[in-house]
């Protein structure tokens, strides 16, 4: 049975030769070189992923939604009742939430995964429960390190099993009342930013309660003393099992050489953890949308990422990842279906990248 260490060790590097071939092919298509902008760079990124066999392509698509409750909810950092996590997880199994509608439109399957809901098991939800809710990070760690490591491995294996069954494009999502608080704590730790710079309103927290949320994040960091150079330490101390789960999807997809679409702020925090745990993950991550949550810009700057969509969204669930899946498919369609300059006897002047 593969260990977490072995999984991380076996993440492949991008295929530079395949990327060079893809760039050459794209430059010969019926358009001025570079005129399709980031669609071209996305196609080249995909071509370098070993799991796609040297060419941009999309097979089956899946959005993995990690669901959990958080002890820090008790600190007054969220307005929604804790039971909403379980209710919405059940709604996801019926296909009625935001991510389900957007994923269906994109032709993707939503996998609803219970990694720590504080309720009885829900029919139709995948059971990977670590505990009924995370610890309250304002008074102690969210979980033990061994729990975090075990969940990272379990989710990574689940992701790789989906890859073996034909999934070639993953999206990550989450569901959990109060989970923007641990996400903000993680972003604060990884980027060295003060809590005031990264704490936002989450699911419509009133402005009058923001200062309390900032204080809770500061207390969580002060009490737990997470090591910013140790991604698992940060996840286990000030994160949450839903954030660990998303990190596991990223590690598993990268191990299989396949792309992962990030969602919003919660996924940025998980991406920071994934890249700290295994820097080789970074080339497999694709940013979908620019979250409207306050700390988004800081997190994305630290990841050196520019999302493809600016939609003022902050729902979470993986909604942005689902919405961006057609962009990935468009990059593949461009690569495979456009005609070539040579076939039409068109010769463009050297350096002509902006005009037809």
Curated annotation (Swiss-Prot):
Keywords: Cobalamin biosynthesis, Glycosyltransferase, Transferase. The keyword Glycosyltransferase applies. GO terms for biological process: cobalamin biosynthetic process. Pathway: Nucleoside biosynthesis; alpha-ribazole biosynthesis; alpha-ribazole from 5,6-dimethylbenzimidazole: step 1/2. GO terms for molecular function: nicotinate-nucleotide-dimethylbenzimidazole phosphoribosyltransferase activity. The active site is at residue 317. Transmembrane segments: none annotated. It catalyses: 5,6-dimethylbenzimidazole + nicotinate beta-D-ribonucleotide = alpha-ribazole 5'-phosphate + nicotinate + H(+). It holds the Pfam family DBI_PRT. Gene3D superfamilies: 1.10.1610.10, 3.40.50.10210. NCBIfam families: cobT_DBIPRT, PRK00105.1. Catalyzes the synthesis of alpha-ribazole-5'-phosphate from nicotinate mononucleotide (NAMN) and 5,6-dimethylbenzimidazole (DMB). PANTHER family: NICOTINATE-NUCLEOTIDE--DIMETHYLBENZIMIDAZOLE PHOSPHORIBOSYLTRANSFERASE. Belongs to the CobT family. Homodimer. This is Nicotinate-nucleotide--dimethylbenzimidazole phosphoribosyltransferase. The gene is cobT.
């Amino acid at each position: 049975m593969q260990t977490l260490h072995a999984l991380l060790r076996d993440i492949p590097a991008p295929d530079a030769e395949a990327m060079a071939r893809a760039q050459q092919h794209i430059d010969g298509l019926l358009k001025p070189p570079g005129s399709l902008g980031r669609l071209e760079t996305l196609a080249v990124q995909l071509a370098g992923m070993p799991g796609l066999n040297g060419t941009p392509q999309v097979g089956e698509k899946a959005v993995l939604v990690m669901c959990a409750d958080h002890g820090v909810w008790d600190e007054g950092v969220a307005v929604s009742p804790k039971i909403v996590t379980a209710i919405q997880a059940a709604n996801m199994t019926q296909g009625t939430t935001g991510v389900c509608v957007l994923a269906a439109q994109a032709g993707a399957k939503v996998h609803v995964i219970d990694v720590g809901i504080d309720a009885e098991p829900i029919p139709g939800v995948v059971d990977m429960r670590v505990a009924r809710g995370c610890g309250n990070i304002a008074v102690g760690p969210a979980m033990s390190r061994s729990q975090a490591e075990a969940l990272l491995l379990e989710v990574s294996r689940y992701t790789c099993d989906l890859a073996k069954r034909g999934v070639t494009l993953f999206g990550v999502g989450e569901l959990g009342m109060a989970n923007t608080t641990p996400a903000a704590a993680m972003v604060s730790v990884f980027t060295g930013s003060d809590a005031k710079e990264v704490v936002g309103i989450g699911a419509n927290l009133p402005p009058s309660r923001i200062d309390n949320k900032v204080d809770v994040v500061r207390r969580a960091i002060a009490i737990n003393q997470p090591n910013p150079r140790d991604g698992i330490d940060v996840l286990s101390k000030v994160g949450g099992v839903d954030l660990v789960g998303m990190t596991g999807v990223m590690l598993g997809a990268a191990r299989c050489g396949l792309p992962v679409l990030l969602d919003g702020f919660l996924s940025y925090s998980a991406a920071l953890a994934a890249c700290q745990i295994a820097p080789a993950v970074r080339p497999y991550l694709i940013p979908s949308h620019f979250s409207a949550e306050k700390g988004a810009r800081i997190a994305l700057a630290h990841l050196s990422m520019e999302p493809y969509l600016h939609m003022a969204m902050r729902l979470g669930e993986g909604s942005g990842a689902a919405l961006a899946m057609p962009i990935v498919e468009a990059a593949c369609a461009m690569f495979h279906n456009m005609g070539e300059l040579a076939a039409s006897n068109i010769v463009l002047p050297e350096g002509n990248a902006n005009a037809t």
